[in-house]
Amino acid sequence: MTVATSELGIKPQVELYPEIEPYDTRMLDLGDGQQIYVEQCGNPEGKPVIFLHGGPGGGGGTERRRFFDPQAYRIVVIDQRGCGLSTPHIASAQTSADMATNTTWNLVDDCERVRTALGIDTWQVFGGSWGSCLALAYAETHPEAVSELVLRGIF
């Protein structure tokens, strides 16, 4: 039996939330020559959510802030090691980024460092594409820190 969402009173969200600017941006030093870019948007008192981008090699862009209601969520966005605004960037000719440190388990540890640095007890973990794999690995190793797990475009 197929039931249209309109029959259930469900209106699908087809538009993203309006563009917003971060209220906090920082570089988090990981102690191994890597720094990751971290930003917070939305409601500082809202439900914490971390957005894990695809790639590897993704990052950047303002669209990732727009998946969440900025009135309800404290939106944490990072650029994973070597991506976006994080340094050193893997695609930069001026640097010799050490790819040996760019492992799944280091990325999982990076997420946990961000959570701790921001003073967050638990958060929703939202991953897309490669970020869905990273989200699963994080949730498996830090279940006490994950309130919900959302995976999209599963890689």
Please give the residue ranges for each predicted region.
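Alpha-helix capping and helix-loop boundary segments enriched in small/acidic/polar residues
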Residues: 98-102
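Short glycine/proline- and charge-enriched loop/turn segments
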Residues: 91-97
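N-terminal cap/lid segment of alpha/beta-hydrolase-fold proteins
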Residues: 12-40
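Conserved hydrolase catalytic core segment
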Residues: 121-155
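Conserved HGGG/HGGXW glycine-rich cap/lid loop of the alpha/beta-hydrolase fold
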Residues: 30-90
